[in-house]
Amino acid sequence: MPSYTLHYFNHRGRAEICRMLFAAAGVQYNDRRVDCSEWTGMRNQMPCSMMPMLEIDNRHQIPQSMAIARYLAREFGFHGRNNLDMARVDFISDCFYDILDDYLRMYHDKDGRMMFQRSYDNGSSSERRMRFQETCRRILPFMERTLEMRNGGNQFFMGDQMTMADLMCYCALENPLTDDTSMLSSYPKLQALRNRVMSHMRMSPYLKSRSSTEF
């Protein structure tokens, strides 16, 4: 088994899908949580000067959260059984990532840096919130219908197999649901899916024991 180190801030943010995949697979890894005060000094050492970044066997570096997530999903069996399945998992995951990305961008400063503070006002928060809300209106009904296409939406996006797509549904909506607990009231299948992820035999202990962070 390779050795893995995941580099990211002490927040869920864009790295949580990767942490959830490690948890779902039961694979050990070094969860390196970088303090914001460390980041300036190490930024230029990172590919694309960004995190998250996955390091494999202290030799290979993979930047970009969704590239990391897809790699882990393939390695651990959470990316579908064939190319068509994988394409389905990918488009569902990307749809939820659009929601996550638009949400987090409401808390970016003018230079594009994530502030990790709910109280932060970047001066364009109203415009960015409107964009986030429009993204949700565009994507959530489609995701509800997509889920219903397999077994009436009563299992997972790929039927009886939990994949990265289900984990993305959970983590992308965590913060938005904190802001608006009724967000999924019109999408009962998605709400039930999140509950299934939360009660999964490996996800439940992880979600209960992980660090509590604002984002």
From Swiss-Prot:
Superkingdom per UniProt: Eukaryota
Protein name: S-crystallin 3
CDD domains assigned to the protein according to its UniProt record, in alphabetical order: GST_C_Sigma_like, GST_N_Sigma_like
Annotated SUPFAM superfamilies: GST C-terminal domain-like, Thioredoxin-like
Domain (GST N-terminal) ranges: 2-80
Classification via Pfam families: GST_C_3, GST_N
GO biological process: glutathione metabolic process
Disulfide bond sites: none
Family: Belongs to the GST superfamily.
Gene Ontology molecular function: glutathione transferase activity; structural constituent of eye lens
